[in-house]
Amino acid sequence: MADIKFRPLHDRVVVRRVESEAKTAGGIIIPDTAKEKPQEGEVVAAGAGARDEAGKLVPLDVKAGDRVLFGKWSGTEVKIGGEDLLIMKESDILGIVG
């Protein structure tokens, strides 16, 4: 896991997808063409937070290293340092795993 030279702004979060198993519990191998994109990932970087109506900074609940679940269509796919990552708002994250 290489350090990325990117700092998201405001309430945005950079997430690395966590690949799912290539085999089912019954031992059937799933080809790449039949796999869905994983909806679980690891937070790589997080912004400082959003501002409320009064202008006060509201920090994010997630931090680098957190394992998160997100919606199937959440985020924008980007390539940073040769690695495919997602940038999404914290509100697109459904929850923290563990």
Swiss-Prot record:
Induction: By heat shock. It is found in: Cytoplasm. GO terms for molecular function: ATP binding; metal ion binding; protein folding chaperone; protein-folding chaperone binding; unfolded protein binding. Its main location: cytoplasm. GO terms for cellular component: cytoplasm. Keywords: Chaperone, Cytoplasm, Stress response. InterPro entries: Chaperonin_GroES, Chaperonin_GroES_sf, Chaprnonin_Cpn10_CS, GroES-like_sf. One of its GO terms (biological process) is chaperone cofactor-dependent protein refolding. Heptamer of 7 subunits arranged in a ring. Interacts with the chaperonin GroEL. Together with the chaperonin GroEL, plays an essential role in assisting protein folding. The GroEL-GroES system forms a nano-cage that allows encapsulation of the non-native substrate proteins and provides a physical environment optimized to promote and accelerate protein folding. GroES binds to the apical surface of the GroEL ring, thereby capping the opening of the GroEL channel. PANTHER family: 10 KDA HEAT SHOCK PROTEIN, CO-CHAPERONIN GROES. Belongs to the GroES chaperonin family. This is Co-chaperonin GroES. The gene is groES.
